[in-house]
Structures are given as C-alpha cells and as structure tokens.
Amino acid sequence: MEPGKGRAQPTRQVLLFFVFLGGSLVYSETWSYSIAEEMEVGTFIANVVKDMGLDVEDLVARGARVIFDDYKPYLRLDPQNGDLLLNEQLDREALCDLTEPCILHFQVLFENPLQFFRAELLVKDINDHTPTFLNNHILLKISEGATLGTLFQIDSAQDLDVGKNGVQNYTISPNPHFHLKLRDGDEGRKYPELVLDQSLDREKESQLSLTLTAVDGGSPPRSGTTLINVVVLDINDNAPEFEKPVYEVHVPESSPLDSLIIKASATDLDAGINGELSYSFSHVSRDVRKTFEIHPISGEVYLKAPLDFEIIQSYIINIQAIDGGSLSGKSSILVRVVDVNDNPPEIAMTSLTSPIPENSSPEMVVAVFSIRDQDAGDNGRMVGSIQDNLPFVLKPTFKNFYALVTEHPLDREVRNEYNITITVTDLGTPRLKTQHNITVLVSDVNDNAPAFTQTSYTLFVRENNSPALHIGSVSATDRDSGTNAQVTYSLLPPQDPHLPLASLVSINTDNGHLFALRSLDYEALQAFEFHVGATDRGSPALSSEALVRVLVLDANDNSPFVLYPLQNGSAPCTELVPRAAEPGYLVTKVVAVDGDSGQNAWLSYQLLKATEPGLFGVWAHNGEVRTARLLSERDVAKHRLVVLVKDNGEPPRSATATLQVLLVDGFSQPYLPLPEAAPSQAQADSLTVYLVVALASVSSLFLFSVFLFVAVRLCRRSRAASVGRCSVPEGPFPGHLLDVSGTGTLSQSYQYEVCLTGGSGANEFKFLKPVIPNLLSRDSDMEKAPPF
C-alpha cells in the first residue's frame, strides 16, 4: 500500500493512507532485534520490558501482544517476564527469498491506554543450501576460428542463501584451452565466463569436456558442479544482433496465462546453418523461468504463470540469440507489472471489549483492529466506516490501526446490544470492500430507581378480620437488570407518631403482599395511611415510595343500644296516659343508637309484645309509641309493652326495650307503681288492723273526694294533658355511640317525673313544669322518620 495525500472525508470514514499519529500513543523509536534462521522454537530474543522501560504488571493488565505486518505469529510475548520468544522456526529463504537484509516489521501493542512500540526483526542467513546448476550438462559450440580471449557465457549456479553464504566463486577443471573469468552482476551475484586461451583445432580435437564447480562463502563452504561439453565448429564470423539492447513492456497483473508478452527479434548476416538463430534465456532468476517462457524459433515471450503486483512489480529477462556457428547476441526485456484492483481490503481484529458498562466515559476504546490492501496507488487507498446513528466512532491510532471508541452516552435500558458492521472500501476501479461484524453488549449499572405501578393504593378491609389476612399488594418494577432490578419492599415510618403501624400491618419484602397483623375494629379505627418503600439491590441502592390508604369497612358487630327508656334493672319509669287521649296520642319515644355505620346503623322499631294488642302502636322509623284507638273504661290500667329495636345489617342485630304504661283518668290521682312482687306476709299482718280501722273511718270522705275529682276532670276534658315521663339522663352520650335517627329526646312533649319514695309506704307525686311547651296545633299526620 502506498502512502498518498490526505483529503477530507464524511463523518465515520477514515482514509488509511494519511494516518500519522503523534502524542503518547506511538513511540517514534524503533527497537531492532536479530535472530538466525532455523533456530528452535522458544529461543530467547530480547526482553521488551527492559528495552521499553515498562513494568511486568503492564503486560497482563494492558493486554500486551505482538503483531506482525502480515499477521503471522512469528514471535510470542511471555507475560510473566516480558521475554520475546521465537514462536515458530524461521526460514529466511521462504520469508524473503533473495532480498537482503531480511527484516520483519512488527509492533508491540498495549491497551488502556492504547500504545504502540515499533520494532523490527532481522533474520540472519545461515549456510543451509548448496549451490546448484539448473542443467547437469552445458553444451558450448565454439568455432575453431574463434580468436584468443573470446568470452563464452555459461550458466551460473543458483544458491538460495544470500550474502557470503551465496555463490562466491567458480572453478573449472584444468585444461590448456580455457580459463575461467568471473563477472559481477546485479545484486552482487557473480557470473562465470570461459576465456579462450589457446586456439581450437577441430581436426585435432572436435570436443572437450570440462567440469565447472560453484563454491559458496559459508563455513564450512558448500559446492556444486556441472559438466561443460565444448563442441568445436567450423568458422562463423558474424554474431546475431537484436533490434534493441533493452525492450520494455507493461503487462497487467490480470493477464491470462499463455498471453504474448513481447516478441524479440535478432538477425545474423551469416548464411546457412551459421545464420539460423535460436532464442533462449540467459542468466535469469528462478522467478523469471517460473513465470515466462520464450519460443526458441520465433523469440516470442509468453506468460507461463500468473503475475502478482503485490509480490513482484517488475522482471528483468536476459535473452540471447545463438546462430548455428555458436555466436550469440544478447538483449534484455524489462517487464513492468501493472497493478489492477484485485485485492479487497483485509480486516484483522486485535482486541474487542464486550460487554461494556452503560456508564462508560466518552472515548472509551471498545475494539482495536488493523486493515491493509495489497494493491498500490488508489487501489490500495481505503476508507473505513460504520453504520450511522450509533454511539460509536472510528478513530485512527497507529499505521493501519484503528480504534472503535464510544462517542455518545450509552443506556442499556434503551438498547442493550449493538451489532456493528465495520466496512473498509478501497478507491480502486471497481471498488472492492470488506465487512466485519462485531457485537457489543452493554452491561447494566444501577441507574434506575424502582417505580411503583401506582403512586397511591387504596385497600379495603372488613373489620373483625382474621389476623395475618392478606389485604392487598403493592408492586414496583425496575428497568435495570440482574441484582440491580431485584426489588425489596418495606414499611416506612408513619408520619403520625401515634399510629401503631408495626402492630397493624406487615409487608412481604419479596413480593409486596400486605397483611393485617390483628383484627381491625371499625368503631375504633375507620382508616389509616402509611408509605411503603421499594429498594433495589444495586450499589448504591436506589429506592422509591408509594402511599397506601387502608379503609376499614364496617361489619354489623354492634347491637342497637337503648338510650331511653333506661334498661338498667332499676325501678322502671312508668308512662302515664290519660284515658281521654285521642288516637295517635304520643305516649313516649324509644331512643336507641347503633355503634356501626351505614345501613348497619339503620334502626327500625316494632312492637314485639303488649298487654293488650291493638291498643298501642310503634312508628317503625322513629320509635314513637302512640295510642292506636280511643281508650275506654274497660281497658285495664296497667300495660307492659316490649319494643324490638332492629338494625339493617346482615345478619341483623336487635335489642328490646320494656315500657310500663299506666292509664289514668287524670294526673291529680295518686300514682301507684305496678307491683312487681307481693308484700311479705309479716308486713301484711302488722298493718291489717290499722288498715281496717282507717278504711272504715275515711271511706265516706274518700268516696266524696273521688266524685268531686271526676266532675272537675270532666270539665277540663277539652284540655287534655300531655304525657308524663321519667327524666332522660342529660349530658353527652358515650363517645362510641352515634344517634343516627336525629331524635335524641321526646319532641313536643311534657316531661314528668313520677317516683316512689322508697321504704315509706306512702306515695308521693311531683308535677313538674313542662320543659318544652306543648304545641296543641300540631299536625294530625304522624311525624316522618328522618331519612337514612
């Protein structure tokens, strides 16, 4: 590949022929080493650590390696001590043929940071080849009229060794007619020539046999021989002459086999057999004989083997024309091989780092590779590129070496794998290209916090639940991978310091399931909220939180509680109802509450038992007890009512209230409590005498008082008295009870207190002033219960 002038190229393309790096990547100094060919594998050459001033630890840590220009592993680097060792036996003749000196160029590559150390290895020749002649017999036809001192060229020997190990001398067997003269040729080679010392006489001796010996300069020297047969001919006084001393021809390397290269023509003024010419090669190299052939009669030169500009750019072909009298003429053909674009670029990966972390800094080296094209000129100039829209870029480093580096930030959650196609195209016609695919994986770092599926969760739990009940779940996901995406859940400290969160709920750290630790009571706690956290297992760990609201659903676990009349087992209060009461007369109102909520606290009332069915009725929605019909003198005075209070839960719960009702003709007559039990026999005996005497003495007066009282009451019948009742305890209800009916007291009624003085045996009736004035103009319609 030939260097060329640099020119600007589009983004991501790199012209290979103008790469010249400065800075610390490449050291300008070139280290030179040498070794003799055919040495054993493992032979020590040098210690690069000492030569280049490096540390042994850098060899492994920075991935040190040896790279030759032709990518063959001639040497290897021992990472333990930095010794440069022979990796395979070297054959100088196979590597460099006749080129001297035989130098192999290589680089010592270090990564992170990227550094190149240029070096070269001189392969020294040893004397391992013997000089050989192409022909075992050399035929010379010499006219007997040849003048003394005439030179006769003879074939030279070939020795694959070079320098002093090549052919250094020729000798010929002793004879009276010839001596040997050596002529220096191209590339320091020596060519033998016979010099005529004594005239030949065909009649005396028509043929001579001589032994030619070739000796090299090795130690010990090697030699080879051939036999020269000299045939003495009649006199031929004109030698052949070529048209040109040198012919020059340009041949494309893609020329087909057997194609005509050139026709060389010579003339001879002699006639007859002395004028008949034959053409042949003269002192040509092995490559020439392998590649070309000459027609002995016409002098046409044909292509015998393929040409390859990348191996040999030109050939010098020495030809001769010999007439029938053994006189010869000489000429040369310079064949210049014309390069064609027949070699695509080559890509050799040196290193590849995969996977790379997604938080890699810009300019991080991902891959290092080298490229080359064996063509010349524009055919060997190359441009490299990768696909667009990738966060990578190609950058030149050292001669024919390039680095694939990061250009933009990476995000594994957006893309975790890149399939990169490196394309190298030459500038020949037609253009040839080579592609190499690499896969770069992006490894995860913990850069994403867990995210809950919802910012807040609302959970519903029915009260009286069993402990360890699963009440719901929270879920969070993490866009990272591996342990960075493994989420654990936890309860965060509540904002309310009085909320005993640790005793209410727990959370499964692995799946986010929430459990109630104990039975919840709606009447004690209707709702509470707390925060849950989700934390990944990355380093450092990232977390997020979400709000959880727990609403306790009411269950029908509270029976109605009767506030009035009191059901505490003490002396019952008795409701007084005048016999003159109209139908719908308000006797009293049963007041009850339910600790539940919603429909579980909707209360309904019904008359469960009555002394006289049909006389009283209970309003189902507000608990008012009213007369169902007009009272008569035939109705008994004492009545016992049992009112059932029932909620609307499922299943419903209930309570009962017992009422004592006394029918009176008027509120001026004394009140006698309903006896619950007969007086003891002892008390009856002690009072019998006194009662009989008192009854007899006052009976007349008593009857008169009764008649007078009845007359007065009849006059006042138009002003019926309102109901009397015992006082309802005043003050707030207990905090855990809720009056949902909205009627906590008797409405539009009088309040009475009728009590019996305990232990006196005498009845005392107290008439109290009304608390709320009675509205006589009340509507005849029943009061509607408040809506639920």
Curated annotation (Swiss-Prot):
Q: According to its UniProt record, where is this protein located?
A: Cell membrane
Q: Where is the signal peptide?
A: 1-28
Is Calcium found in the keyword set? yes
User: In UniProt terms, what function does this protein have?
Assistant: Potential calcium-dependent cell-adhesion protein.
Any GO MF annotation of the entry: calcium ion binding
Q: Which residues cross the membrane?
A: 692-712
Annotated Cadherin domain ranges read: 29-133, 134-242, 243-347, 348-452, 453-562, 569-672
Q: Which InterPro entries match?
A: Cadherin-like_dom, Cadherin-like_sf, Cadherin_C, Cadherin_CS, Cadherin_N, Protocadherin/Cadherin-CA
Name the Gene3D superfamilies for this protein. Answer: Cadherins
GO (cellular component) term, any one: plasma membrane
Q: What membrane topology does the annotation report for this chain?
A: Single-pass type I membrane protein
Disulphide-bonded residues: none
Which loops or segments lie on the Cytoplasmic side of the membrane, by the record?
713-788
Q: Which gene encodes it?
A: PCDHB18
Q: What is this protein called?
A: Protocadherin beta-18
Q: Which UniProt keywords apply?
A: Calcium, Cell adhesion, Cell membrane, Glycoprotein, Membrane, Repeat, Signal, Transmembrane, Transmembrane helix
- Organism the protein comes from: Pan troglodytes
A GO biological process held by the record: homophilic cell adhesion via plasma membrane adhesion molecules
Task: State which ranges are Extracellular (membrane side).
Answer: 29-691
